[in-house]
């Protein structure tokens, strides 16, 4: 037998020593350290917040390891073929679906999701524990289905962003379909825009031929569909119809979306009328007849305007018309320029004749040019006033001469209201004019209306509150502050509150519910012409004028137009420098500030400006060569 071990008894001193060690706890140590701070003024006690950037990933890694080991798992999620052990707290923290279930019954041990695919659920659970997932177009369907059902919004957004990044001609319609199924508005809108912008390439893909009638119909209705010409849209529609004879029943409904009025008469005869379906189907034939009548009745086109006569895929751009360029003072310009948002100023076309101080207006998609002067004679401008009136069609790059004004006019104003044009005042060789005449497109005639109370020229007008408001100008032998309004419904004039500053050769433009008057000149203290820099704004509702930000550069006989809620003031004459100007000044009413935009190609006075809806650059370049060489028949 082994000898017994001898027990060593501890004396009282040793016991007391052990007690001292135990009492030296973390709290005691803390108190001891805090005591060192008391009475010390040299130590900084400013607190700082620190973040352990690895804490979150480490926590997720730990939770994921616990799930793999089924350690402390307290919930089972089941599908028809597979079950998963998870932690309630993890699933409830990222899924509104689980949060609501467990909040309602915290004792829940199992949740069965028989409508969710095991692959989708497994991916969702992995995401909940790691914040990571692997996506492909082959698996995203089951994943996004589970994410939407379980209301995991961050995962839904990741799937939506993935779809947007993956959009291509081959899969764009699949993206539209899946986005529509799960209400992914951003992904759907992005995919639809991709299809609109790449419609020609998309029409050559296999997906295009699989479109339902509703899907292709929605595309052909779209105003923003990018095409080289509407004839191509017709040929693409026929291609879809011809693919399956069962689709013939949709021919009239589908082709009603083609803007036949924007196809030239020659192309209608050569490439549309030759398609048997367009002659055999009564409804399709009517579409063709309506388009031909539209072309045969140019003076009635305003009243015949419809969705099928409007261009698609275009944009609204600034247009300049005529004027007197500074580098060739003795020569007037026939040029019409447009400002491309990407490429700057380019020549669009030429007017039938040179002019400046003419007036322009846009109505029903057409550009109208009226009056002005056909010769450069600074000493007697009124002598060369003309009554010419013509219309430009941007769809076909064509001009037609319209009925001349009843009186020759220069330094007048031209306004559009309710489908009619109103020419106000001005002057000619007989002097200043008080007359007002109205152009009626359906009759191609000008009708006299109630005249101004007093003759005036060099004024500016714009339409606001349903009336043509005429501001300032030259009355008698003086600049005027007078403001009056013409009511077309009453054929009557009414005086309005006057401008604060007299001015002439200025501009007026309507932005929102207000009228803005800018630029022009007046007489200085020594009788000399001086620039008017103040800009005034009129509220028809309050019948009150107020000042807004002044012009950076004073100009007279400039052009003005509104675009995207801003006013653009182009070119003109500066009295201070005695120079023609090429500057473009932009006014933002929301910020009440002027900025200098780009410049005109050449300093110009007597230039007119407007905003016109133009076909996209592709269509402008290829309208004459956009006809497909592949015949279609159905």
UniProtKB/Swiss-Prot annotation:
Modification(s) after translation: N-terminus is methylated by METTL11A/NTM1.
Organism: Mus musculus
Name the UniProt record assigns to this protein: Kelch-like protein 31
Annotated signal peptide: none
Keyword Coiled coil listed: no
Alphabetic keyword roster: Kelch repeat, Methylation, Repeat, Repressor, Transcription, Transcription regulation
Lineage of the organism: Eukaryota, Metazoa, Chordata, Craniata, Vertebrata
Domain of life: Eukaryota
Residue ranges crossing the lipid bilayer per the database entry: none
N,N,N-trimethylalanine PTM positions: 2
């Amino acid at each position: 037998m082994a000898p017994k071990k001898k027990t060593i008894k501890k004396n009282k001193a040793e016991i007391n020593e052990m007690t001292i060690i135990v009492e030296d706890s973390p709290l005691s140590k803390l108190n001891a350290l805090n005591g060192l701070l008391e009475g010390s003024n040299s130590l900084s006690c400013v607190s700082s917040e620190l973040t352990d950037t690895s804490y979150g990933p480490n926590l997720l890694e730990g939770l994921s390891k616990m799930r793999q080991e089924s350690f402390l798992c307290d919930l089972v999620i089941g599908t028809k073929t597979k079950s998963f052990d998870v932690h309630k707290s993890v699933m409830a923290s990222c899924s509104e679906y689980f949060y609501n279930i467990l909040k309602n019954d915290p004792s829940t041990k199992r949740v069965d999701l028989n409508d969710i695919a095991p692959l989708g659920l497994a991916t969702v659970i992995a995401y909940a524990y790691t914040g990571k997932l692997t996506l492909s177009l082959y698996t995203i369907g089951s994943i996004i289905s589970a994410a939407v059902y379980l209301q995991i919004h961050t995962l839904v957004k990741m799937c939506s962003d993935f779809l947007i990044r993956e959009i291509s001609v081959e899969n764009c319609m699949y993206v539209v379909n899946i986005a529509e199924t799960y209400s992914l508005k951003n992904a759907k809108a992005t995919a639809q825009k991709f299809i609109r912008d790449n419609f020609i390439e998309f029409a050559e893909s296999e997906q295009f031929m699989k479109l339902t009638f509703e899907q292709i119909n929605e595309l052909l209705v779209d105003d923003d569909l990018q095409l080289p010409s509407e004839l191509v849209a017709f040929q693409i529609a026929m291609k879809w119809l011809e693919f399956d004879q069962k689709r013939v029943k949709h021919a009239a409904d589908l082709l009603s979306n083609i803007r036949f009025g924007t196809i030239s008469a020659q192309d209608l005869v050569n490439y549309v009328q030759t398609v048997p379906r367009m002659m055999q189907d009564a409804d399709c034939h009517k579409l063709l007849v309506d388009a031909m009548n539209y072309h045969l009745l140019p003076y009635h086109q305003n009243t015949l305007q419809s969705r099928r006569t409007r261009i698609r895929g275009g944009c609204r751009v600034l247009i300049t018309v005529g004027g007197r360029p500074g580098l060739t003072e003795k020569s007037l310009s026939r040029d019409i320029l447009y400002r491309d948002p990407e490429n700057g100023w380019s020549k669009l076309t030429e007017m039938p004749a040179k002019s400046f101080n003419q007036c322009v207006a846009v109505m029903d998609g057409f550009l109208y040019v009226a009056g002005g002067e056909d010769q450069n004679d600074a000493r007697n401008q009124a002598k060369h006033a003309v009554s010419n009136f013509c219309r430009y069609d941007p769809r076909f790059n064509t001009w037609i001469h319209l009925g001349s004004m009843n009186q020759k006019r220069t330094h007048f104003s031209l306004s559009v209201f309710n489908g009619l044009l109103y020419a106000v005042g001005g002057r000619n060789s007989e002097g200043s004019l008080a007359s007002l005449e109205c152009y009626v497109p359906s009759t191609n005639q000008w009708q006299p209306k109630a005249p101004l109370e007093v003759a005036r020229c060099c004024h500016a007008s714009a339409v606001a509150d349903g009336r043509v408001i005429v501001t300032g100008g030259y009355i008698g032998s003086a600049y005027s502050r007078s403001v009056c309004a013409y009511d077309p419904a009453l054929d009557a004039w009414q005086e309005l509150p006057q401008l604060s500053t007299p001015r002439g050769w200025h501009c007026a433009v309507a932005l929102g519910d207000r009228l803005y008057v800018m630029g022009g000149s007046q007489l200085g203290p020594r009788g000399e012409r001086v620039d008017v820099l103040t800009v005034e704004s009129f509220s028809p509702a309050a019948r009150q004028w107020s000042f807004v930000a002044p012009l950076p550069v004073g100009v007279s006989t400039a052009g003005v137009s509104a675009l995207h809620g801003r006013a653009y003031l182009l070119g003109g004459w500066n009295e201070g420098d005695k120079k023609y100007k090429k500057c473009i000044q932009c006014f933002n009413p929301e910020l009440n500030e002027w900025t200098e935009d780009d410049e005109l190609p050449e300093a110009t006075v007597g230039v007119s400006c407007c905003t016109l809806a133009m076909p996209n650059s592709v269509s402008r370049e290829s309208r004459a060569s956009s006809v497909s060489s592949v015949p279609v028949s159905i």
